[in-house]
Amino acid sequence: MKKRRAHLAEQATHGFTRRSFIKGAAALTATGALVGCSPQTQNLEKAEPQKGAPETQIFSGACRSQCGQGCYLDVHVRDGQVVRTTAGHFEDGPEFDRICPKGLSQPARVYSSERLQYPMRRVGERGAGEFERITWDEAISEITDKWKQYIDEFGPTSIAFFLGSGNTAELGGGAPEGSVMARLLNVMGASRVLPDRDIATPMSWTYMFGPGSAGNRASDVPNADHHVIWGGDTAVSDKQRTHFYLEARDAGSELVVIDIAYRTMASKADWFVPVHPATDGALALGVVREILEQSWEATDFLRDHTEAPFLIKEDGMFLRMSDLGVEPTTTTNAQGQEEKVDPCVVWDEEAGEAVAHSEAKKPAMGDVPEIAGHAVKTEMEMIREAVAPWTLEHTSEVTGVSADDIKHLAHLYTQEGNVQTDMKFGLNHYNNGIYSSKCVNTLLLVAGQMGKPGSGLYTGEPNFGEGNVQACLQLPSTTGEVPQGVGAIINWSDFFNVVSSGQKLGEPFPVKAFYASCTNIVSNQTEQNETIELMKALEFIVIQDMTMNDTSLYADILLPACHWFETEDLRVRYYGNPYLLWNQKAIEPLYESKPDFEIYKLLAEGMGYGDFFQFTADEYLNTCLSTPFGKENGITIDKVREKNYLRCDTEPAVAFEGGIFKTASKRAMFYREAPKPDYNMGQEVDLEKEKFSCYWEPAREADLGNPIREQFPFTICCEHMRTRTHTQWYDVDYMKEFEAQPVCRINPEDAAELGIEEGDEIRLYNDRGSVTLLAVLNAGQQRKSLHCPRSFLTREHIDGDLARTTFNDYNQACRNQSYFDCAVAIEKL
């Protein structure tokens, strides 16, 4: 592997390598050839230290956007101004000392011309961006007077909160479930609008492995013989993790990338497997079939650590001991509630009889006789039946992956040592994302690549998490009152219908006011034209943010939140490292901006709920930290402040080590007998699709075989950008030197057929909307597949917006926005 990689590198550089450059540079320096670099000190005056230079202070900081990395920053301040940022240092984890261009350019965000400087009131047409300056007293008074009026007339659920993820900190953030904004919502009894993003893939892990972290820690990376990055470009979207893979590759492991385009991480891989968009689940099923065909499945692991031996009756329910005449018992769960205990049955080959699964010596996974009058099948039999149609030929036809590559993947996952899989959210962003993710999970289980060092998934570095959410939300007032709780849940896909119709599930449900913080929903949610209509239909909108982004333009009242470096806070929601991070206040808030924490408390006071917010920042943070892990380890905010970071290894290095999962049976699950949708909008649901992990169906629009592709032949991947997190950093001008404007990467053969050349303006369109951008010819693109960086504001596009081409409908049972499941046609302008 090493020789092959070195040979390819030599070819790519025509023999000119970093080592040869260094040797050549050394030789040239020795002969004086590098004149501009050689020492010439004879004519230089001795430099004297600058007198009276301002002292540089370094403060602890954290990058708090929702890229998920949670990078630790040193914030350099001189004369009360932020002058630079550098990577912070973890004494007990230097492998996480990382900073990216976004972290390095934070000072430009602090001093951005786009900063909201003072509270403002809309004076023009909504969306036109015409505002007048008002005072904080006026802003809080107008907001709370309106809210009280709506509550008196329509009830507290007429006010809807959207908790954004643009500031993932406990005091000022929206997204952390126990944030102060979430507490304000609970105290008021308002409605909560769920963003419904990035749900499908994590939900697949919960369904099959149980709740909580499902991935191995970074320390386990060196134990893998192969690393498979499936459905993403970690070099852009997961910078904290990427260097571990590259170091492991350099140490001898194989790096495999399965993706829909040849991107940065694919260029670093030993083996790149291109797959048609949204067909990853089909590929996994084809690989499973080949494994079973070759009898390579991990029989002992499947028998002992999964529910593969469990028996399913013809009615789709588990065969349980009660079916054999054994009365169920009861037990008390962790919440103090009584639960019925009726164990699932397996056929014990040693005993030659049906027994409770926990009592079996050797559970059967093949044919099982009729038991107590019930015809049954093992889950393993069902897996074999489900993958039978996925022959090498059929799988290759659907996915575009060659039969040889499918066979190679089957061999790699079962015959070539430990395989660790990093399943990225590329799979998540399609309407069939939940099914594709479960199919890949099934592959890992059938191959036995779970629960041991060097195997399993990467799902984010296990860490402290979001803290004691319930304690934060249910903290009584100073008079002993308890918060009302969330008044109602509204899914994003249903929000426009609820607002425009005044009904929810056929019942009256007026929503009049909308409050969003730390978010840019107009740019970041799907089907932008509908979002704009929603914003116009609402009576009263309050937006709290740092900048004049696309959503700010639609506000009735704008509240200026200060930058992260202008206040103190605790970074809690992140996936890139195992640390709690303390963000010190480095400078005073600029202009009239205020910390989000302070704004939430002002709104609470104005609403008459001040008694619920009579706590200091430290008191609230200590409540957040009072989890069982926090209590056991004596974690307080003062302890975090000792070094401004605190390592929290809340999970073992290897998830499910020894094959012990977090499900009720302690086994990994392939089947759920009574699944339920995770949202309710009155939709029709075929629950048969949701029961079994081997169910797969094509994507709604991205699938090549969909008839819609005759009218709209291209699909768009709206990918992450290096220089932005969602739309944050849009206001950093020198980042635009790297990604200056919206572009569309298109395969040169597709471009030639349409008469498109590099730099041409092209219009992507469908029945929902359109966007105009510049064409970039890229041979790394598959035919009929486009890639467009997705973090530009609407006003940065030539015309339209990528978000206008997407749809806002969910999978029947999974509340997940499908950013990539989008078909368009192309017009050259």
Feature locations, PLM:
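N-terminal export/assembly segments and adjacent metallocofactor-ligating motifs
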Residues: 2-300, 304-364, 375-376, 393, ...
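N-terminal leader/propeptide and maturation segments of large enzyme subunits in energy/redox metabolism
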Residues: 118, 122-138, 296-403, 586-671, ...
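Long, contiguous, secondary-structure-rich segments that constitute the structural scaffold
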Residues: 596-640, 727-745, 749-829
